[in-house]
Every structure is written in structure tokens, then in C-alpha cells.
Regions:
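Domain-level signature for proteins that mediate thiol-based redox and metal-cofactor handling
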Residues: 1-131
Length: 131
């Protein structure tokens, strides 16, 4: 087994009828989240279906991005004792429902709306088919 996969943090399964994780964090993504939390408080992710920055996972202070029935909660991470939700637009989920998502981080400029932007880092999604 690939050691990078073994060290990923899986989100708890939350969709009705499912018992598997749909989303994970790489160790690097978790480390960045732990650095961002003291600055911004509790955090959340939202993945929209837009183009450009809209196709990247956006990290917000929890509650700053308002979710609705147009969004799906894909998973909840336990990041050292604090919950971190990962949401996706329902429309995007229809395209990606057969996909496992891994949140990773790379050096580079992301969206100015996502809290990691001033760090010179950006979150991105790596995906693979479920199953």
C-alpha cells in the first residue's frame, strides 16, 4: 500500500446509507489547516461547480459561507478534536458522485476568498474513482 494514502485523514461518512469516506486530507493539508485555525477559528470547506477558482476547494471560517439545500455535506473531519465539514454544491456532486476526493495543498496563488491565500499556498482536489 502507498504510504501517502495510509497517512491521509479520512472524513466520517455522513451521507445516508453510506459507510465509506468520500473525502480525505493529505498530511500537508491537515498541517496547513492546523496553522490556519488559530488565525481564523473553526474552518469549513466548500467545493462549488464553477470554473476557475470555483473548481478548487474553498476554505472559510465556519459559518462564513452559508450552505443550503443546494449543497451536500460529503464528510466531517476530526482535525485534532475539532470538526471540519466538507460541503459540495449538489449540482457538482451529481458529476462527482462516483469519485473519492483528497484535499491536498500546493505552493501557489489561490482565490483571495479562501483563507489559505495569504500563506502562498492553495488547496486543491485530487480525485479517484470510488470502488
Amino acid at each position: 500500500m502507498d504510504s501517502s494514502i495510509a497517512s491521509e485523514l479520512d472524513a466520517a461518512a455522513v451521507l445516508p446509507g453510506e459507510n465509506f469516506s468520500r473525502v480525505a486530507l493529505t498530511p500537508e493539508a491537515k498541517e496547513l489547516l492546523l496553522r490556519l485555525r488559530p488565525i481564523h477559528g473553526e474552518l469549513m470547506f466548500h467545493q462549488s461547480g464553477g470554473c476557475c477558482d470555483g473548481s478548487s476547494p474553498m476554505c472559510y471560517p465556519k459559518g462564513e459561507f452559508l450552505t443550503s439545500e443546494a449543497d451536500v455535506l460529503l464528510g466531517v473531519f476530526d482535525v485534532e478534536g475539532e470538526e471540519l465539514e466538507f460541503w459540495m454544491s449538489r449540482e457538482q456532486f451529481e458529476y462527482w458522485k462516483h469519485t473519492h476526493l483528497t484535499v491536498d495543498v500546493v505552493t501557489g496563488r489561490g482565490s483571495g476568498f479562501s483563507v489559505e491565500a495569504p500563506e502562498g499556498k492553495r488547496f486543491l482536489i485530487r480525485s479517484r474513482l470510488l470502488g
